[in-house]
Amino acid sequence: MASVAAAAVSVPSFSGLKAETKAAPARLSSTSVVRMAPVVRASASSDALKTVGKALLAASSSLLLVASANAATVKMGGDDGALGFYPKDISVAAGESVTFVNNKGFPHNVVFDEDAVPAGVKTEDINHEDYLNGPNESFSITFKTPGTYEFYCEPHQGAGMKGVVTVS
């Protein structure tokens, strides 16, 4: 006949226990550490600030002069390769410059129609008849006399590559 054995297991109960929350006292060291801020002479600091300020003023003044002297940039040829000046109508103040930049590498130039510039302006002084053949080749023209200046690209005039500069 079979026999059955029973085993008894005792499980301790943890109900009602509380964790102690006291912290151990901190230990103090007899070694002291003193941190000091760096010493800066006020005159050296203000001299440096004055120098930086002058440099910033000079740089910003130079940028303003360049920005006002070069009033417009005209791409010769479109980003998609189209023949044209972009923009084709430009307005600037007298004494300002327009920079023409060859955009895609076709041979381009800028020729002013002698019958379509203000009286007294010599087109040979402002024409750029030499071809710009490579991308990003450029030249600038400063317009001194107020009025309307019509220009074109000599090899692409028949394709409508024309523009107008209005100087006030």
Swiss-Prot record:
Main location, first listed in the record = plastid
**One GO MF term attached to the UniProt entry:** copper ion binding
PROSITE patterns for this protein: COPPER_BLUE
* Compartments (UniProt record): Plastid, Chloroplast thylakoid membrane
Presequence range in chain numbering: 1-70
Which keywords does this Swiss-Prot/TrEMBL entry list?
A: Chloroplast, Copper, Electron transport, Membrane, Metal-binding, Plastid, Thylakoid, Transit peptide, Transport
Positions with a binding annotation for Cu cation: 108, 153, 156, 161
Q: What does this protein do?
A: Participates in electron transfer between P700 and the cytochrome b6-f complex in photosystem I.
Q: Which GO terms describe its cellular component?
A: chloroplast thylakoid membrane
Which classification does the entry list for the species? Answer: Eukaryota, Viridiplantae, Streptophyta, Embryophyta, Bryophyta
Species per Swiss-Prot/TrEMBL record: Physcomitrium patens (Spreading-leaved earth moss)
Put simply, this protein is called Plastocyanin, chloroplastic
What this protein needs as a cofactor is: Cu(2+)
Segments forming domain Plastocyanin-like: 71-168
Membrane topology recorded in Swiss-Prot or TrEMBL:
Peripheral membrane protein
What gene is it encoded by? PETE
Q: Which CDD domains match?
A: Plastocyanin
Known NCBIfam families for this protein? cyanin_plasto (TIGR02656)
Say which family it is in: Belongs to the plastocyanin family.
